Amino acid sequence: MSGRSGKKKMSKLSRSARAGVIFPVGRLMRYLKKGTFKYRISVGAPVYMAAVIEYLAAEILELAGNAARDNKKARIAPRHILLAVANDEELNQLLKGVTIASGGVLPRIHPELLAKKRGTKGKSETILSPPPEKRGRKAASGKKGGKKSKATKPRTSKKSKAKDSDKEGTSNSTSEDGPGDGFTILSSKSLVLGQKLSLTQSDISHIGSMRVEGIVHPTTAEIDLKEEIGKALEKAGGKEFLETVKELRKSQGPLEVAEAAVSQSSGLAAKFVIHCHIPQWGSDKCEEQLEETIKNCLSAAEDKKLKSVAFPPFPSGRNCFPKQTAAQVTLKAISAHFDDSSSSSLKNVYFLLFDSESIGIYVQEMAKLDTK
C-alpha cells in the first residue's frame, strides 16, 4: 500500500444534525452563554431548547394552515397566525403579550353595542330602568306638618296582587332564566315571530349541564359518539345515555344524509338530544344538504313541542366544513324556517360556541340579519 492513500476526510456534522433538529443548536448555545455567563450551562440545554422551539413553530404553522383552509385561502397570512394562537389555550397564555405584525385584532363586541343596531328584522332589546324618585316640595311640606302628615301607602286589593303575580309568572315562563352556570350569553337577536337567537360561549365539557330542552348532536349515519360533541355528551350522560343511543341506533339507524332522530337525554340537563347526519364538505350539494339538516332539526324539535334548542358549531370532526360557510348556512336556514312557518313552539335558539374565531364569525353573520 502506498503512503499517499490517507484517511478520507469526514464531513463535519453540526450539533443540530447530530441532535436531529433543524434549529441551530450552536447559535442557541452562544446566546445562552452570552447572557448567563455566570452559570454553568450543560451541553443538552440548547438541544432541548431548539427542540421545544421547533415543536412550537410546527404547532403554530399547523393551526395557521387550518385557519387559512377555513377561510378558503391558499397562503398563510399573519391574520391566520393570530387566529391560530388565539384558538389554542396554551399558546394564547404563552404568547399573550406578543404582537403579531399585520395580524389585526380579535373581535370583542359587547352585547349592549349590538342591541343598539337598527334593522328591519331584528328587534333591539333595551332594559328600561325606573326613573329616580323626585324629592320636591311635598316632602318639605310633610316635614313642616309634623306628626299629622304621615305617609300613606296606597291600598292594593287582593285581586290586583293576583293579577300582578300572574303577569310575573307569564313573563318568567316565556323568558327563560338562561342556559345555566358556566354559559355566557354574548349577544342576542329577536326575529319577526319572536324567536330569540343567542350567541353563547362556554367550554365543551359543560355541554351536559346546559339547561335547554333540546341539544343538537352532529354525527354520522351510524349515530356514533366519536366526535368532540359526542364524546362530551357521553362523558356527561354516562352509561345511561350510551344505552339510549344504542337503542336509537337499533330502531332508527342508519340515518340518511340530513336526517334527524330524537332520543331521550339520560343523565343530561337537557330533555332531548337531536342526532343529525351532517354532510361531508366537498360533496355534491353539501351546502343545500346542511341547510336541510338544520331545518330537519328544527322540525324535530317542534314535533316534540320544545321551547329551546342549542346548536353547536357544525364544522366538527370529519366533515371539514369551513366555519364561515357553516355559520352562513346555519343562520340562513334558521331564518328561512321561521319565515316559512306561521307558528312555532320554539322560543329560544342558542348557538353554543367554544373558540374565539367562531364567536367572531357568528357575531359578524348575525349582524347581517338586520340588513336583509
Curated annotation (Swiss-Prot):
GO terms for molecular function: chromatin DNA binding; protein heterodimerization activity; RNA polymerase II transcription regulatory region sequence-specific DNA binding; structural constituent of chromatin. Transmembrane segments: none annotated. It is found in: Nucleus; Chromosome. Residues 2-117 form the Histone H2A domain. The keyword Acetylation does not apply. Residues 114-182 are annotated as: Disordered. GO terms for biological process: brain development; establishment of protein localization to chromatin; negative regulation of gene expression, epigenetic; negative regulation of transcription by RNA polymerase II; negative regulation of transcription of nucleolar large rRNA by RNA polymerase I; nucleosome assembly; positive regulation of keratinocyte differentiation; sex-chromosome dosage compensation. There is a cross-link at residue 239 (Glycyl lysine isopeptide (Lys-Gly) (interchain with G-Cter in SUMO2)). The modification N6-lactoyllysine is found at residues 7, 9. Keywords: Chromatin regulator, Chromosome, DNA-binding, Isopeptide bond, Nucleosome core, Nucleus, Ubl conjugation. SMART domains: A1pp, H2A. Residues 184-370 form the Macro domain. It comes from the Eukaryota. One of its GO terms (cellular component) is nucleoplasm. The nucleosome is a histone octamer containing two molecules each of H2A, H2B, H3 and H4 assembled in one H3-H4 heterotetramer and two H2A-H2B heterodimers. Variant histone H2A which replaces conventional H2A in a subset of nucleosomes where it represses transcription. Nucleosomes wrap and compact DNA into chromatin, limiting DNA accessibility to the cellular machineries which require DNA as a template. Histones thereby play a central role in transcription regulation, DNA repair, DNA replication and chromosomal stability. DNA accessibility is regulated via a complex set of post-translational modifications of histones, also called histone code, and nucleosome remodeling. May be involved in stable X chromosome inactivation. This is Core histone macro-H2A.2.
